[in-house]
A protein has these predicted regions:
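Anaerobic metallocofactor- and corrinoid-dependent redox/one-carbon enzyme cores
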Residues: 1-192
Length: 192
């Protein structure tokens, strides 16, 4: 996502990422969000030791990666969808991108470019949380389509949440539902 002059610059990006990694979610970012997290020190492997939950910390230490991965400029979000497609193909986690325990977020979006990227994610089947509503609140039909109706078609949908901690909760709830559906929330013997 972008930076938005209507909110404290970088705050939502960093708070959302910190909350997700604290809760053992590997975060992939692009553009301004990635830069915000880099400035906050989250794009170095040592960040996993200080900020990540225990299982994410273990994975990051074993592989030697930070808990937040930089995937390129803001227009490189297709790389994230390509990674999701590869996880789907190689990992056998469902039949469609919409089956994956993954979500998108743009907590400080301000440009139409970010909106277009969000639509690309939703059309690909992902749940996307935006920090403030799209300019569609005047039409119940359009709002209902973007925030629910598309889920019946693509598996993806939008939701708005300005508070980054509450946005993280919504993303985590979505991830847990997808993990339950894939039956990968079952405790198993550790391999690492």
């Amino acid at each position: 996502g972008c930076n938005n002059p209507k909110v404290t610059v970088d705050n939502s990006h960093v708070r959302l990422a910190e909350e997700l990694i604290r809760r053992n979610v590997l975060v992939l970012q692009t553009g301004c969000a990635a830069v915000a997290c880099a400035k906050a020190g989250l794009l170095v492997p040592e960040a996993a030791l200080e900020k990540a939950g225990p299982t994410l910390r273990e994975v990051c230490e074993a592989v030697g990666i930070p808990p937040v991965l930089h995937m390129g400029s803001c227009v490189d979000n297709s790389r994230i969808l390509l990674a999701a497609t590869n996880i789907l193909a190689e990992g056998g986690l469902g039949e469609d991108i919409s089956d994956l325990p993954a979500a998108g977020a743009a907590p400080e979006w301000m440009s139409e470019k970010a909106v277009a990227i969000g639509h690309y994610f939703v059309a690909s089947g992902l749940y996307v949380v935006l920090g403030h509503p799209l300019y569609v609140e005047g039409s119940d039909n359009v709002h209902d389509l973007l925030c629910g109706g598309l889920e019946k078609i693509t598996g993806g949908r939008f939701e708005w949440e300005p508070d980054p901690v509450l946005a993280a909760e919504k993303i985590l709830d979505h991830i847990e539902r997808k993990r339950d559906a894939l039956r990968i929330n079952v405790k198993r013997e550790r391999k690492l």
